[in-house]
């Protein structure tokens, strides 16, 4: 029986950051793109994930406000490696979405980097992607999503 796979729901447009990039640079990426998670990549390998929630948690709430002080602006200079999640749970593109969902629930994560056979990132699957698939297909394993290949 055919099942919905991660490669039918994952985002393949990857925007990555490096561990030595600043939170200011990450903020610009989040402002420019409609992502909630960025992969932190070094030498073509995923070394971490940073989310928009991580960014908000580590930036001063006064950045960009009239009451901003030097120490508030300094939070923009913090490095990604200081705040990223390091224990990254990854997945393969040919994994079914039920297993992806179990991995997210078991590990308490909201995204899974999708890696190829060389362990290089080729996409990201998020809880939103999985929820959209269920909303569109229900539990029908033969369902085809509008943007899926095959």
Question: Would you name each region that the model predicts?
Answer:
Residues 37, 44-45, 66-69, 76-78, ...:
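Short, surface-exposed, polar/charged, turn-prone segments marking secondary-structure boundaries
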């Amino acid at each position: 029986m055919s099942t919905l796979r991660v490669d039918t729901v994952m985002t393949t447009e990857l925007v990555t950051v490096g561990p030595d990039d600043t939170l200011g640079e990450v903020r610009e990426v989040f402002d420019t793109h409609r992502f909630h998670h960025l992969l932190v990549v070094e030498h073509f390998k995923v070394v971490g994930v940073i989310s928009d929630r991580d960014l908000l948690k580590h930036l001063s709430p006064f950045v960009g406000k009239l009451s901003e002080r030097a120490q508030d602006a300094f939070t923009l200079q913090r490095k990604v490696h200081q705040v990223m999640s390091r224990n990254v749970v990854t997945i393969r593109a040919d994994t079914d979405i039920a297993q992806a969902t179990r991995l997210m629930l078991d590990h308490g994560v909201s995204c899974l980097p999708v890696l190829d056979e060389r362990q290089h990132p080729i996409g990201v699957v998020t809880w939103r992607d999985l929820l959209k698939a269920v909303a569109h297909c229900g539990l029908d394993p033969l369902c085809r999503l509008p943007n899926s290949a095959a």
